[in-house]
Regions:
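Hydrophobic h-region of N-terminal signal peptides that target proteins for export
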Residues: 7-17
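Short loop/turn motifs that connect adjacent beta-strands in outer-membrane beta-barrel proteins
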Residues: 17-20, 49-53, 90-98, 148-156, ...
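Transmembrane beta-barrel domains of Gram-negative outer membranes and organellar outer membranes
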Residues: 21-140, 213-229
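Outer membrane beta-barrel transmembrane domains
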Residues: 22-24, 28-33, 37, 64-69, ...
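Transmembrane beta-barrel strands of outer-membrane/channel proteins
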Residues: 23-29, 54-60, 100-106, 156-164, ...
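Residues that define the transmembrane beta-barrel architecture of outer-membrane proteins
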Residues: 37-43, 77-81, 96, 133-141, ...
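Residues on the lipid-exposed face of transmembrane beta-strands in outer-membrane beta-barrel proteins
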Residues: 43-47, 83-89, 102, 141-147, ...
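Gram-negative outer-membrane beta-barrel domains
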Residues: 87-94, 99, 106-109, 126-154, ...
Length: 282
């Protein structure tokens, strides 16, 4: 009897030690819509295991340089570079995330260097990065909760981000078919590994919407036009998102398309971008 109990305990330990971690990369870019403006690039590289995640994030913002001319108001280029740590609590009907992020906004975030390297390979209109605001500390705390309501395929997301650069509250929903344990990072506004708590082999499609109420947005302030006034951001911001994903034993892929409402009055069109997430289990 004691031997049987010991074998069961050893098997449980072996199973626990065999639990895989997850490495994922999420790349957002407006090239999916043939543009290079406003929120032009975002990259998150992260490693998650046992509900603890560590990551590196870079977001880059530029004016609509292709259509800009002197006298036209637009956002000045800038970037963020953040180290991120997150705690995930997951259950079949719940996903809660708390993120702590610390880094810089401005020249030290390497937005100019990153876009220059990319545009050596992919041509794009010239952006005058001397208009970038000076550097500042970028720190934030984000809390997001996602949970099912009424039906398995209906999920709500809500939470808030409090930071030195950007502060907002958000609430939204998504309708998802297939593997309903997945959630959209683009509607959660928090680190969201594209991992399933269901089957090792699964597919999923979703569509959803979210509303943000901005309390602070330092990413929109300086005007790209040196003679123009400072820009004022819009407080209510809506987002539409849709996507699909596949999950295999070794990892997975996810594709998303997003449309954001105008973030400032001089913006000439909604912001649209695509996102690709690549997951590797190891």
């Amino acid at each position: 009897m004691k031997l049987a109990a010991l074998l069961v305990a050893c098997a449980a330990c072996a199973h626990a030690s065999a639990d895989e971690g997850h490495f994922y990369t999420q790349i957002a870019n407006d090239v999916a819509f043939g543009t290079d403006r406003w929120y032009t690039s975002g990259v998150r590289m992260a490693r998650e295991k046992d509900g603890i995640e560590w990551g590196l994030v870079q977001d880059i913002y530029t004016p609509d340089a292709k259509n800009w001319h002197p006298g036209k108001d637009d956002r000045a280029p800038t970037a963020r570079l953040l180290g991120s740590g997150a705690l995930h609590q997951r259950a079949p009907e719940l996903w809660q995330t708390i993120e702590f992020a610390l880094g810089v906004q401005g020249p030290a975030a390497l937005g100019h260097q990153t876009t220059s390297a990319v545009h050596h390979l992919v041509p794009a209109p010239h952006v005058d990065w001397t208009r970038q605001p000076g550097g500042r500390l970028d720190a934030q705390v984000a809390i997001t909760r996602s949970q099912r309501v009424a039906f398995d395929f209906v999920k709500v997301h809500y939470g808030a981000t409090l930071g030195t650069v950007t502060t907002f509250a958000h609430a939204g929903f998504e309708l998802r078919a297939g593997d309903t344990t997945l959630s959209s990072a683009l509607l959660r506004f928090a680190p969201t590994p594209p991992t399933s708590t269901g089957s090792d082999h699964a597919w999923s499609v979703y569509a959803g919407a979210s509303e943000r109420v901005m309390g602070r947005e330092e990413l929109i302030s300086r005007n790209y036009d040196p003679l123009g006034p400072d820009l004022k951001y819009r407080r209510p911001l809506s987002r539409l998102a849709a996507g699909l994903s596949w999950k295999w034993r070794w990892g997975g892929l996810a594709f998303d398309l997003v449309q954001d409402a105008k973030e400032f009055n001089a913006q000439t069109a909604p912001q649209r971008f695509g996102s690709v997430s690549i997951l590797i289990d190891f």
